[in-house]
């Protein structure tokens, strides 16, 4: 791991600590295997929602984790090892303003 990457990991770990983490994961997959990959990803309990989409990514997943380290372990040890997954990009949720059609109050925002 490069020094820059280690610094980034440290900042993220300190920011999120042991708090639960929600994220959006963009997956690039082998086009011919998109349905098979989607079925495998959908079986992972951490994945809350999964969509086949157009654009730069092929699949978009919403996922939840106990903490940042659990997210990191999931990406490295499980998701990236699924046959047909070419690349992933993880977007960590900082604040949730609206979820499942409901606007969150100030106290509910995460």
Q: Predicted segments — roles?
A:
Residues 1-110:
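A compositional/biophysical signature of low hydrophobicity enriched in polar/charged and small residues
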